[in-house]
């Protein structure tokens, strides 16, 4: 079972919105740094960068936005969290599923960092990706339909392929 959620990474909003913002989850650079936090991943093999350098991911993403004239856009990137039921997957399996989710959902068009964190009872992936395609400068679409048919649908399909449980509509989903 993989529980997924997606968070839009935006630039700083007005101070009146600061209450609802969590800077650790909304700034692109901080999200990349958080995903690659060595204290949470324990081993380098649980970090993968797609279409960018692992150590230069933020710089690569910012350069893509500049190259396509999109650096002033509100949406900087996205942070997907994919959490698994405790004991259902190994760290290697969780990471492989996260990388495959990124490949299938984003079609090789965006810079992506996938990091599997082992710091909780439930293993979870952080998939942080640029809102701007490095291939053509197009922005990632982020409607509810795109989420349910795209990211969540692909995550569910991967879980089914691996023989893992899948959250059905209406079930209590969040892992403890």
Model segments located where?
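N-terminal nicking endonuclease/strand-transfer module with a His-rich metal-binding environment
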Residues: 1-176
